[in-house]
Protein backbone atom coordinates (compact mmCIF):
# COMPACT_ATOMS: atom_id res chain seq x y z
CA UNK A 1 0.00 0.00 0.00
CA UNK A 2 1.53 3.31 -1.05
CA UNK A 3 1.54 6.39 1.13
CA UNK A 4 -1.05 9.19 1.03
CA UNK A 5 0.26 12.20 -0.88
CA UNK A 6 -1.21 14.50 1.78
CA UNK A 7 1.66 13.35 3.98
CA UNK A 8 4.18 14.75 1.50
CA UNK A 9 2.27 18.03 1.14
CA UNK A 10 2.27 18.52 4.90
CA UNK A 11 5.93 17.54 5.11
CA UNK A 12 7.25 19.80 2.31
CA UNK A 13 5.33 22.96 3.24
CA UNK A 14 7.74 25.77 4.26
CA UNK A 15 10.73 23.41 4.08
CA UNK A 16 14.06 24.63 2.71
CA UNK A 17 14.48 22.48 -0.40
CA UNK A 18 17.55 22.20 -2.63
CA UNK A 19 17.05 20.85 -6.15
CA UNK A 20 20.23 19.79 -7.97
CA UNK A 21 19.97 20.15 -11.73
CA UNK A 22 17.65 22.41 -13.72
CA UNK A 23 16.98 19.87 -16.46
CA UNK A 24 13.94 18.35 -18.14
CA UNK A 25 12.67 16.42 -15.11
CA UNK A 26 13.51 19.04 -12.51
CA UNK A 27 11.86 22.11 -14.08
CA UNK A 28 8.31 20.74 -13.48
CA UNK A 29 9.50 19.46 -10.08
CA UNK A 30 10.70 22.94 -9.03
CA UNK A 31 7.41 24.51 -10.15
CA UNK A 32 5.49 21.83 -8.23
CA UNK A 33 7.51 22.37 -5.05
CA UNK A 34 6.86 26.13 -5.24
CA UNK A 35 3.13 25.40 -5.62
CA UNK A 36 3.29 23.20 -2.49
CA UNK A 37 4.80 26.07 -0.49
CA UNK A 38 8.43 24.98 -0.29
CA UNK A 39 11.33 27.46 -0.19
CA UNK A 40 13.34 26.30 -3.20
CA UNK A 41 16.98 26.79 -4.17
CA UNK A 42 17.95 25.34 -7.55
CA UNK A 43 21.53 24.35 -8.42
CA UNK A 44 23.00 23.95 -11.90
CA UNK A 45 26.37 24.06 -13.63
CA UNK A 46 24.88 26.20 -16.41
CA UNK A 47 25.08 29.98 -16.16
CA UNK A 48 22.11 32.35 -16.06
CA UNK A 49 22.74 33.18 -19.74
CA UNK A 50 22.76 29.49 -20.72
CA UNK A 51 19.50 28.84 -18.84
CA UNK A 52 17.89 31.91 -20.43
CA UNK A 53 14.17 32.35 -19.76
CA UNK A 54 14.13 29.48 -17.27
CA UNK A 55 16.34 31.39 -14.82
CA UNK A 56 14.36 34.65 -15.06
CA UNK A 57 11.08 32.72 -14.68
CA UNK A 58 12.34 30.99 -11.52
CA UNK A 59 13.73 34.20 -10.04
CA UNK A 60 10.34 35.85 -10.55
CA UNK A 61 8.77 32.96 -8.61
CA UNK A 62 11.15 33.44 -5.69
CA UNK A 63 13.52 30.54 -6.43
CA UNK A 64 17.12 31.10 -5.31
CA UNK A 65 19.61 30.10 -8.01
CA UNK A 66 23.13 28.76 -7.45
CA UNK A 67 24.75 28.52 -10.88
CA UNK A 68 28.10 28.12 -12.63
CA UNK A 69 31.28 26.16 -11.97
CA UNK A 70 31.18 25.96 -8.17
CA UNK A 71 27.40 25.65 -8.03
CA UNK A 72 27.40 22.91 -5.35
CA UNK A 73 29.51 24.83 -2.83
CA UNK A 74 26.38 26.23 -1.20
CA UNK A 75 24.50 22.92 -0.94
CA UNK A 76 24.21 23.27 2.81
CA UNK A 77 21.53 24.07 5.39
CA UNK A 78 18.61 22.31 3.63
CA UNK A 79 15.79 20.20 5.05
CA UNK A 80 15.32 18.29 1.79
CA UNK A 81 17.55 17.79 -1.27
CA UNK A 82 16.30 16.41 -4.60
CA UNK A 83 19.26 15.05 -6.53
CA UNK A 84 19.50 14.62 -10.28
CA UNK A 85 19.46 10.91 -11.38
CA UNK A 86 23.08 10.83 -12.58
CA UNK A 87 24.39 12.21 -9.27
CA UNK A 88 25.96 9.52 -7.13
CA UNK A 89 24.62 9.31 -3.57
CA UNK A 90 28.21 9.00 -2.31
CA UNK A 91 29.26 12.31 -3.89
CA UNK A 92 30.98 14.54 -1.34
CA UNK A 93 28.36 17.30 -1.32
CA UNK A 94 25.45 14.85 -0.77
CA UNK A 95 27.29 13.01 2.01
CA UNK A 96 27.91 16.38 3.70
CA UNK A 97 24.31 17.64 3.45
CA UNK A 98 23.01 14.26 4.63
CA UNK A 99 25.26 14.47 7.70
CA UNK A 100 23.68 17.85 8.42
CA UNK A 101 20.34 16.04 8.66
CA UNK A 102 18.87 16.71 5.21
CA UNK A 103 16.47 14.19 3.64
CA UNK A 104 18.09 13.33 0.28
CA UNK A 105 15.76 11.95 -2.40
CA UNK A 106 14.83 12.17 -6.10
CA UNK A 107 11.75 12.96 -8.17
CA UNK A 108 11.36 9.28 -9.13
CA UNK A 109 11.64 7.94 -5.58
CA UNK A 110 8.94 10.29 -4.30
CA UNK A 111 6.72 9.48 -7.27
CA UNK A 112 6.89 5.73 -6.58
CA UNK A 113 6.31 6.33 -2.86
CA UNK A 114 3.02 8.21 -3.36
CA UNK A 115 1.62 7.00 -6.71
CA UNK A 116 -1.84 5.38 -6.29
CA UNK A 117 -1.83 3.51 -9.61
CA UNK A 118 -0.34 0.13 -10.50
CA UNK A 119 3.29 0.65 -11.55
CA UNK A 120 5.20 -1.27 -14.21
CA UNK A 121 8.94 -0.61 -13.80
CA UNK A 122 11.18 -1.58 -16.73
CA UNK A 123 14.96 -1.78 -16.66
CA UNK A 124 17.75 -3.61 -18.51
CA UNK A 125 20.82 -2.81 -20.58
CA UNK A 126 18.98 -2.89 -23.91
CA UNK A 127 15.34 -2.75 -24.95
CA UNK A 128 14.08 -0.61 -22.04
CA UNK A 129 12.50 2.17 -24.09
CA UNK A 130 10.93 -0.10 -26.70
CA UNK A 131 9.54 -2.48 -24.04
CA UNK A 132 8.25 0.46 -21.98
CA UNK A 133 6.55 1.89 -25.06
CA UNK A 134 5.05 -1.48 -26.09
CA UNK A 135 3.63 -2.04 -22.59
CA UNK A 136 2.12 1.45 -22.53
CA UNK A 137 0.58 0.98 -26.01
CA UNK A 138 -0.97 -2.35 -25.00
CA UNK A 139 -2.42 -0.93 -21.78
CA UNK A 140 -3.87 2.00 -23.76
CA UNK A 141 -5.33 -0.42 -26.30
CA UNK A 142 -7.00 -2.24 -23.39
CA UNK A 143 -8.59 1.06 -22.33
CA UNK A 144 -6.46 2.10 -19.35
CA UNK A 145 -5.44 5.72 -18.87
CA UNK A 146 -1.70 5.17 -19.03
CA UNK A 147 1.09 7.43 -17.79
CA UNK A 148 4.63 6.98 -19.12
CA UNK A 149 7.63 8.33 -17.23
CA UNK A 150 11.14 7.77 -15.94
CA UNK A 151 13.72 8.06 -18.71
CA UNK A 152 11.01 8.74 -21.31
CA UNK A 153 7.61 10.39 -21.40
CA UNK A 154 7.07 13.29 -19.02
CA UNK A 155 8.17 13.94 -15.41
CA UNK A 156 5.24 12.48 -13.48
CA UNK A 157 5.69 13.65 -9.89
CA UNK A 158 4.21 17.08 -10.67
CA UNK A 159 1.09 15.29 -12.02
CA UNK A 160 0.72 12.83 -9.15
CA UNK A 161 -2.60 14.24 -7.91
CA UNK A 162 -4.17 13.65 -11.35
CA UNK A 163 -3.25 9.94 -11.40
CA UNK A 164 -6.08 7.67 -10.24
CA UNK A 165 -5.82 4.23 -8.64
CA UNK A 166 -7.48 2.60 -11.68
CA UNK A 167 -4.87 4.10 -14.07
CA UNK A 168 -1.65 2.39 -15.10
CA UNK A 169 1.88 3.82 -14.87
CA UNK A 170 4.82 2.57 -16.96
CA UNK A 171 8.32 3.71 -15.92
CA UNK A 172 11.58 3.23 -17.79
CA UNK A 173 14.24 3.14 -15.06
CA UNK A 174 17.99 3.50 -15.52
CA UNK A 175 20.66 2.12 -13.19
CA UNK A 176 21.21 5.69 -11.94
CA UNK A 177 17.55 6.10 -10.98
CA UNK A 178 17.56 2.67 -9.32
CA UNK A 179 20.76 3.12 -7.26
CA UNK A 180 18.79 4.80 -4.48
CA UNK A 181 15.38 3.19 -5.10
CA UNK A 182 14.09 1.32 -2.04
CA UNK A 183 10.39 1.06 -2.94
CA UNK A 184 8.46 -1.75 -4.64
CA UNK A 185 7.21 -1.87 -8.24
CA UNK A 186 3.97 -3.81 -8.75
CA UNK A 187 5.49 -5.38 -11.86
CA UNK A 188 9.28 -5.23 -12.31
CA UNK A 189 10.67 -6.12 -15.75
CA UNK A 190 14.36 -6.75 -16.41
CA UNK A 191 14.86 -7.16 -20.17
CA UNK A 192 18.53 -8.26 -20.05
CA UNK A 193 21.87 -7.22 -18.55
CA UNK A 194 25.29 -6.74 -20.14
CA UNK A 195 28.19 -4.39 -19.34
CA UNK A 196 27.11 -0.74 -19.69
CA UNK A 197 27.71 2.68 -18.06
CA UNK A 198 31.00 1.47 -16.59
CA UNK A 199 32.22 5.07 -16.84
CA UNK A 200 29.65 5.99 -14.16
CA UNK A 201 29.61 2.84 -12.01
CA UNK A 202 32.58 1.64 -9.97
CA UNK A 203 32.36 -1.78 -11.62
CA UNK A 204 29.96 -4.25 -13.22
CA UNK A 205 28.80 -5.52 -9.81
CA UNK A 206 27.66 -2.06 -8.75
CA UNK A 207 25.74 -1.76 -12.04
CA UNK A 208 24.01 -5.12 -11.42
CA UNK A 209 23.26 -4.22 -7.78
CA UNK A 210 21.61 -0.97 -8.90
CA UNK A 211 19.40 -2.88 -11.34
CA UNK A 212 18.41 -5.35 -8.60
CA UNK A 213 16.71 -2.56 -6.65
CA UNK A 214 13.84 -2.78 -9.12
CA UNK A 215 12.72 -6.00 -7.37
CA UNK A 216 14.53 -6.28 -4.02
CA UNK A 217 11.85 -4.26 -2.18
CA UNK A 218 8.91 -6.23 -3.58
CA UNK A 219 6.72 -8.55 -1.51
CA UNK A 220 4.63 -11.64 -2.27
CA UNK A 221 1.94 -9.56 -4.01
CA UNK A 222 4.39 -8.19 -6.62
CA UNK A 223 5.81 -9.73 -9.79
CA UNK A 224 9.29 -9.90 -11.33
CA UNK A 225 9.76 -10.61 -15.05
CA UNK A 226 13.14 -12.09 -16.07
CA UNK A 227 14.79 -13.11 -19.32
CA UNK A 228 15.38 -16.87 -19.15
CA UNK A 229 18.20 -16.57 -21.69
CA UNK A 230 20.17 -13.88 -19.86
CA UNK A 231 22.34 -15.46 -17.18
CA UNK A 232 22.41 -12.38 -14.93
CA UNK A 233 18.68 -11.59 -14.94
CA UNK A 234 17.74 -15.26 -14.63
CA UNK A 235 19.94 -15.34 -11.52
CA UNK A 236 17.69 -12.68 -9.94
CA UNK A 237 15.06 -15.37 -9.48
CA UNK A 238 16.82 -16.67 -6.36
CA UNK A 239 16.51 -13.30 -4.60
CA UNK A 240 12.94 -12.46 -5.66
CA UNK A 241 10.34 -12.10 -2.92
CA UNK A 242 7.30 -12.05 -5.21
CA UNK A 243 5.99 -14.05 -8.16
CA UNK A 244 8.60 -14.65 -10.90
CA UNK A 245 7.56 -14.96 -14.53
CA UNK A 246 9.92 -15.70 -17.41
CA UNK A 247 10.21 -15.08 -21.13
CA UNK A 248 12.45 -16.86 -23.62
CA UNK A 249 13.33 -16.61 -27.29
CA UNK A 250 14.92 -20.08 -27.24
CA UNK A 251 12.79 -22.52 -25.24
CA UNK A 252 9.17 -23.34 -24.46
CA UNK A 253 7.92 -22.09 -21.10
CA UNK A 254 4.66 -23.56 -19.90
CA UNK A 255 3.72 -20.52 -17.79
CA UNK A 256 5.81 -17.88 -19.54
CA UNK A 257 6.08 -16.07 -22.86
CA UNK A 258 8.20 -17.75 -25.52
CA UNK A 259 9.12 -17.89 -29.20
CA UNK A 260 9.05 -21.07 -31.26
CA UNK A 261 9.07 -21.73 -35.01
CA UNK A 262 8.21 -18.18 -36.01
CA UNK A 263 5.40 -17.71 -33.45
CA UNK A 264 5.22 -15.79 -30.14
CA UNK A 265 3.28 -17.57 -27.39
CA UNK A 266 1.93 -16.60 -23.98
CA UNK A 267 1.22 -19.51 -21.61
CA UNK A 268 0.94 -21.85 -24.59
CA UNK A 269 -1.46 -19.63 -26.58
CA UNK A 270 -0.40 -18.03 -29.85
CA UNK A 271 -0.24 -14.23 -29.71
CA UNK A 272 1.22 -13.37 -33.12
CA UNK A 273 3.63 -14.43 -35.85
CA UNK A 274 7.13 -12.97 -35.92
CA UNK A 275 6.75 -11.97 -39.57
CA UNK A 276 3.66 -9.89 -38.74
CA UNK A 277 5.48 -7.78 -36.12
CA UNK A 278 6.20 -4.38 -37.66
CA UNK A 279 9.53 -3.77 -35.87
CA UNK A 280 12.07 -6.36 -36.97
CA UNK A 281 14.81 -8.33 -35.25
CA UNK A 282 15.00 -10.99 -32.55
CA UNK A 283 15.75 -8.30 -29.96
CA UNK A 284 12.27 -6.91 -30.65
CA UNK A 285 10.76 -10.40 -30.37
CA UNK A 286 12.28 -10.49 -26.87
CA UNK A 287 10.90 -7.02 -26.09
CA UNK A 288 7.41 -8.21 -27.06
CA UNK A 289 7.73 -11.43 -25.04
CA UNK A 290 8.70 -9.37 -21.97
CA UNK A 291 5.72 -7.06 -22.55
CA UNK A 292 3.28 -9.96 -23.06
CA UNK A 293 4.19 -11.76 -19.84
CA UNK A 294 4.31 -8.48 -17.88
CA UNK A 295 0.79 -7.42 -18.90
CA UNK A 296 -0.72 -10.92 -18.76
CA UNK A 297 -3.30 -9.91 -16.11
CA UNK A 298 -4.17 -6.54 -17.65
CA UNK A 299 -4.25 -7.00 -21.44
CA UNK A 300 -6.08 -9.45 -23.71
CA UNK A 301 -4.17 -11.50 -26.29
CA UNK A 302 -6.24 -9.77 -28.97
CA UNK A 303 -4.93 -6.34 -27.93
CA UNK A 304 -1.36 -7.62 -27.57
CA UNK A 305 -1.56 -8.88 -31.17
CA UNK A 306 -3.08 -5.59 -32.37
CA UNK A 307 -0.15 -3.57 -31.00
CA UNK A 308 2.50 -6.01 -32.29
CA UNK A 309 1.06 -5.80 -35.80
CA UNK A 310 0.72 -2.00 -35.87
CA UNK A 311 3.37 -0.33 -33.66
CA UNK A 312 6.17 0.92 -35.91
CA UNK A 313 8.86 1.55 -33.33
CA UNK A 314 10.55 4.31 -31.39
CA UNK A 315 12.68 7.03 -32.98
CA UNK A 316 16.46 6.39 -33.18
CA UNK A 317 16.00 2.59 -32.98
CA UNK A 318 16.73 0.93 -36.36
CA UNK A 319 14.67 3.79 -37.81
CA UNK A 320 14.54 3.93 -41.63
CA UNK A 321 15.46 7.51 -42.57
CA UNK A 322 15.16 7.27 -46.36
CA UNK A 323 16.12 5.32 -49.46
CA UNK A 324 18.34 7.00 -52.07
CA UNK A 325 19.34 5.29 -55.35
CA UNK A 326 18.38 1.91 -53.91
CA UNK A 327 20.40 2.43 -50.69
CA UNK A 328 18.56 2.43 -47.34
CA UNK A 329 19.80 4.64 -44.48
CA UNK A 330 18.95 3.61 -40.91
CA UNK A 331 19.30 5.63 -37.70
CA UNK A 332 20.12 3.38 -34.72
CA UNK A 333 21.70 6.13 -32.62
CA UNK A 334 20.25 4.60 -29.41
CA UNK A 335 22.83 1.78 -29.77
CA UNK A 336 25.31 3.03 -27.19
CA UNK A 337 26.84 -0.37 -26.35
CA UNK A 338 28.32 -3.22 -28.43
CA UNK A 339 25.49 -5.61 -27.46
CA UNK A 340 22.92 -3.08 -28.65
CA UNK A 341 24.71 -2.63 -31.98
CA UNK A 342 24.92 -6.42 -32.42
CA UNK A 343 21.16 -6.72 -31.90
CA UNK A 344 20.59 -4.03 -34.53
CA UNK A 345 22.94 -5.66 -37.05
CA UNK A 346 21.19 -9.01 -36.65
CA UNK A 347 17.84 -7.39 -37.47
CA UNK A 348 18.92 -6.87 -41.10
CA UNK A 349 18.83 -9.66 -43.65
CA UNK A 350 22.18 -8.72 -45.24
CA UNK A 351 25.63 -7.34 -44.42
CA UNK A 352 25.59 -3.61 -43.83
CA UNK A 353 27.80 -0.54 -44.03
CA UNK A 354 28.20 0.30 -40.34
CA UNK A 355 29.00 3.75 -38.94
CA UNK A 356 30.27 3.32 -35.37
CA UNK A 357 32.33 4.95 -32.62
CA UNK A 358 31.83 7.67 -30.04
CA UNK A 359 32.35 8.38 -26.35
CA UNK A 360 34.29 5.80 -24.34
CA UNK A 361 32.15 4.16 -21.61
CA UNK A 362 34.98 1.67 -20.88
CA UNK A 363 33.18 -1.22 -22.56
CA UNK A 364 34.86 -4.11 -24.36
CA UNK A 365 34.50 -4.09 -28.16
CA UNK A 366 35.69 -7.68 -28.78
CA UNK A 367 32.07 -8.97 -29.01
CA UNK A 368 31.36 -6.45 -31.78
CA UNK A 369 34.22 -7.88 -33.84
CA UNK A 370 33.91 -11.56 -32.94
CA UNK A 371 30.12 -11.78 -33.23
CA UNK A 372 29.46 -8.82 -35.52
CA UNK A 373 31.79 -9.44 -38.46
CA UNK A 374 29.36 -11.67 -40.46
CA UNK A 375 26.89 -8.76 -40.54
CA UNK A 376 29.35 -5.99 -41.57
CA UNK A 377 30.24 -5.22 -45.18
CA UNK A 378 32.20 -2.00 -44.50
CA UNK A 379 33.07 -0.32 -41.20
CA UNK A 380 33.32 3.46 -40.86
CA UNK A 381 34.72 4.69 -37.54
CA UNK A 382 34.67 8.07 -35.83
CA UNK A 383 34.89 9.54 -32.35
CA UNK A 384 36.92 8.89 -29.22
CA UNK A 385 36.74 5.09 -29.53
CA UNK A 386 37.67 4.67 -33.20
CA UNK A 387 41.17 3.32 -32.42
CA UNK A 388 39.83 0.91 -29.77
CA UNK A 389 37.25 -0.48 -32.20
CA UNK A 390 39.78 -0.65 -35.06
CA UNK A 391 42.19 -2.59 -32.82
CA UNK A 392 39.68 -5.39 -32.08
CA UNK A 393 38.91 -5.80 -35.79
CA UNK A 394 42.65 -5.88 -36.59
CA UNK A 395 43.05 -8.54 -33.88
CA UNK A 396 40.24 -10.52 -35.55
CA UNK A 397 42.15 -10.31 -38.85
CA UNK A 398 45.43 -11.36 -37.20
CA UNK A 399 43.93 -14.29 -35.25
CA UNK A 400 41.33 -15.62 -37.70
CA UNK A 401 42.21 -14.08 -41.05
CA UNK A 402 38.83 -12.32 -41.22
CA UNK A 403 39.25 -8.88 -42.77
CA UNK A 404 36.67 -6.09 -42.61
CA UNK A 405 37.45 -2.92 -44.57
CA UNK A 406 37.76 0.01 -42.16
CA UNK A 407 37.57 3.73 -42.95
CA UNK A 408 38.33 6.38 -40.34
CA UNK A 409 36.69 9.82 -40.41
CA UNK A 410 36.50 12.86 -38.13
CA UNK A 411 32.86 13.97 -38.41
CA UNK A 412 29.42 12.47 -38.90
CA UNK A 413 29.13 14.38 -42.20
CA UNK A 414 32.32 12.69 -43.44
CA UNK A 415 31.02 9.32 -42.25
CA UNK A 416 27.77 9.63 -44.21
CA UNK A 417 29.62 10.87 -47.32
CA UNK A 418 32.07 7.96 -47.10
CA UNK A 419 29.20 5.48 -46.65
CA UNK A 420 27.38 6.95 -49.65
CA UNK A 421 30.51 6.55 -51.81
CA UNK A 422 31.00 2.94 -50.71
CA UNK A 423 27.35 1.93 -51.13
CA UNK A 424 25.90 0.15 -54.14
CA UNK A 425 22.24 -0.36 -55.05
CA UNK A 426 20.56 -2.67 -52.52
CA UNK A 427 22.97 -1.78 -49.70
CA UNK A 428 22.05 -0.77 -46.15
CA UNK A 429 23.86 1.99 -44.26
CA UNK A 430 23.25 2.15 -40.51
CA UNK A 431 24.45 4.53 -37.81
CA UNK A 432 24.74 2.14 -34.86
CA UNK A 433 27.63 3.57 -32.82
CA UNK A 434 28.11 0.96 -30.03
CA UNK A 435 29.08 3.99 -27.91
CA UNK A 436 27.52 6.95 -26.15
CA UNK A 437 27.48 10.31 -27.94
CA UNK A 438 29.09 12.62 -25.40
CA UNK A 439 32.41 13.11 -27.24
CA UNK A 440 30.58 14.88 -30.10
CA UNK A 441 26.90 15.35 -29.16
CA UNK A 442 24.99 16.10 -25.92
CA UNK A 443 22.89 12.91 -26.27
CA UNK A 444 21.96 10.08 -28.64
CA UNK A 445 18.84 11.93 -29.85
CA UNK A 446 20.79 14.96 -31.06
CA UNK A 447 23.29 12.58 -32.71
CA UNK A 448 20.45 10.70 -34.41
CA UNK A 449 18.74 13.89 -35.54
CA UNK A 450 22.03 15.20 -36.97
CA UNK A 451 22.45 11.94 -38.90
CA UNK A 452 18.90 12.24 -40.27
CA UNK A 453 19.51 15.86 -41.23
CA UNK A 454 22.70 14.91 -43.13
CA UNK A 455 20.98 11.98 -44.88
CA UNK A 456 17.95 14.08 -45.83
CA UNK A 457 20.24 16.66 -47.44
CA UNK A 458 22.01 14.12 -49.68
Curated annotation (Swiss-Prot):
Reactions catalysed according to its record: UDP-N-acetyl-alpha-D-muramoyl-L-alanine + D-glutamate + ATP = UDP-N-acetyl-alpha-D-muramoyl-L-alanyl-D-glutamate + ADP + phosphate + H(+)
Domain of life, per lineage: Bacteria
Keywords associated with the record: ATP-binding, Cell cycle, Cell division, Cell shape, Cell wall biogenesis/degradation, Cytoplasm, Ligase, Nucleotide-binding, Peptidoglycan synthesis
Pathway: Cell wall biogenesis; peptidoglycan biosynthesis
Gene3D superfamilies associated with the record: Mur ligase, C-terminal domain (3.90.190.20), Mur-like, catalytic domain (3.40.1190.10), NAD(P)-binding Rossmann-like Domain (3.40.50.720)
Subcellular location: Cytoplasm
Main location: cytoplasm
Residues that hold ATP according to the record: 124-130
GO cellular component: cytoplasm
SUPFAM superfamilies per the UniProt record, alphabetical: MurCD N-terminal domain, MurD-like peptide ligases, catalytic domain, MurD-like peptide ligases, peptide-binding domain
GO terms, molecular function: ATP binding; UDP-N-acetylmuramoylalanine-D-glutamate ligase activity
EC id: 6.3.2.9
Gene Ontology BP, a term: regulation of cell shape
HAMAP family: MurD (MF_00639)
Function: Cell wall formation. Catalyzes the addition of glutamate to the nucleotide precursor UDP-N-acetylmuramoyl-L-alanine (UMA).
Family statement: Belongs to the MurCDEF family.
Protein name: UDP-N-acetylmuramoylalanine--D-glutamate ligase
Organism: Clostridium botulinum (strain Eklund 17B / Type B)
Gene: murD
